[in-house]
Amino acid sequence: MTNTRAIYAVIAILAIVISAVESTGDFGDSLDFVRAGSSSLFSGCTGSIAECIAEEEEMEFDSDISRRILAQKKYISYGAMRRNSVPCSRRGASYYNCQRGAQANPYSRGCSTITRCRR
């Protein structure tokens, strides 16, 4: 008995939606919430996914993938922060002190449990 009531409810809702769509006259305009999420749904595009997706949606997809890849790493390299530039081109030099003859690691810290140095 409960199943038949559920079926009747679904049929009634579908009938209301269909009558609302037909009364507006234009199928595409009445379902803006569907078209906003998938611009190529009704276009009949037969190309690749990249060709069928609008440019702005494609760029959002690309940045989403980039964020996921960066989220998997524990660090961001200097190359990712500044494209086409090298922080220090001298071999073995520190990124922070890129002068000739400078120490590669000028920092010194005391021995403690946190630094795990051997005593």
Curated annotation (Swiss-Prot):
Localization of this protein: Secreted
Any one GO biological process: cell-cell signaling
Primary subcellular site in the record, as a coarse category: secreted
The alphabetical list of record keywords is: Disulfide bond, Hormone, Secreted, Signal
Annotated site residue numbers, Required for proteolytic cleavage: 67-68
Give the propeptide positions. Answer: 24-70
Q: Which residues form the signal peptide?
A: 1-23
PTM comment, free text:
Proteolytically cleaved, probably by S1P, a subtilisin-like serine protease (subtilase).
- Pfam families annotated for this entry? RALF
The record lists its disulfide bonds as: 88-98, 111-117
Its cellular-component GO annotations read: apoplast; plasmodesma
Molecular function via GO: hormone activity
Do you know which InterPro entries this protein is assigned to?
A: RALF
Q: What does this protein do?
A: Cell signaling peptide that may regulate plant stress, growth, and development. Mediates a rapid alkalinization of extracellular space by mediating a transient increase in the cytoplasmic Ca(2+) concentration leading to a calcium-dependent signaling events through a cell surface receptor and a concomitant activation of some intracellular mitogen-activated protein kinases.
For this protein, the record's PANTHER family field holds: PROTEIN RALF-LIKE 22, RAPID ALKALINIZATION FACTOR-LIKE
Provide the family line.
Belongs to the plant rapid alkalinization factor (RALF) family.
Protein name (Swiss-Prot/TrEMBL): Protein RALF-like 22
> What species is given as this protein's source?
Arabidopsis thaliana (Mouse-ear cress)
Organism phylogeny: Eukaryota, Viridiplantae, Streptophyta, Embryophyta, Tracheophyta
